[in-house]
Amino acid sequence: MIHSKRLKMCLCLIILSVFIGACGMKKEESSKDKQIKENFNKTLSLYPTKNLEDFYDKEGFRDEEFDKGDKGTWIVDSEMVVELKDKKMESRSMVLYINRNTRTTKGNFIVRELWEDSKGYAQSKDTKYPVKMEHNRIIPTKQIADDKLRKEIENFKFFVQYGDFKDINDYKDGDISYNPNVPSYSAEYQLSNNDYNVKQLRKRYNIPTKKAPKLLIKGDGDLKGSSIGHKNLEFTFVENKEENIYFTDSINFKPTE
């Protein structure tokens, strides 16, 4: 009888220990999730920045990678990628290097095509059009004979100029992940077509699907901050072996090269 009571007591202690341990793990995981969200929120707070020249006066994260006196360079990049069945993958993107030292900005508008040749080897073709920014306007630095293309470049807007994540904390059922070995971290959310940012993308791009996208926010490097790390957003509308439709955007602060 005494042996039976001791056995029951031991079992209760074991169950209690497991329960306490599980609670501790859950608390630790929740703490890491919170840290990841806080890290992303620092970047997302930059959206929207309607006037790109405001980046001349915006300070980013600095570490030992920066030379003394280097104010740093903001790199903004937006890209729309469409690959339909039995068609070439085509992307149209623009990247700007916003130099805080010289208060000048230059970059490229890039048209990229990817396809497989008759032997199944991947082939690609990039066409770059150099640009500069003055008074928040994109200006091609070389003559472009194609009026439609020239207007597309001059009227280009980066996602940071119109995207808005003020409701990011209301996004539900996010899948937060962290890999300490890289380190890398991400947060993924299923959006609806009524989402503000989705509406803005559809307004500006010909997106050949009615499917609502998933939003993936990902980064790498030290969670506390790193100029070596990289963060970007990805709105994936379609992703399979035959078709891919997605939009990517990034804002990163780096030492000036």
Swiss-Prot record:
One of its GO terms (cellular component) is plasma membrane. Residues 1-22 form the signal peptide. It holds the Pfam family DUF576. Gene3D superfamilies: 2.50.20.40. It comes from the Bacteria. It is found in: Cell membrane. A lipid is attached at C23 (N-palmitoyl cysteine). Keywords: Cell membrane, Lipoprotein, Membrane, Palmitate, Signal. A lipid is attached at C23 (S-diacylglycerol cysteine). Belongs to the staphylococcal tandem lipoprotein family. This is Uncharacterized lipoprotein SAR2573. The lineage of its organism: Bacteria, Bacillati, Bacillota, Bacilli, Bacillales.
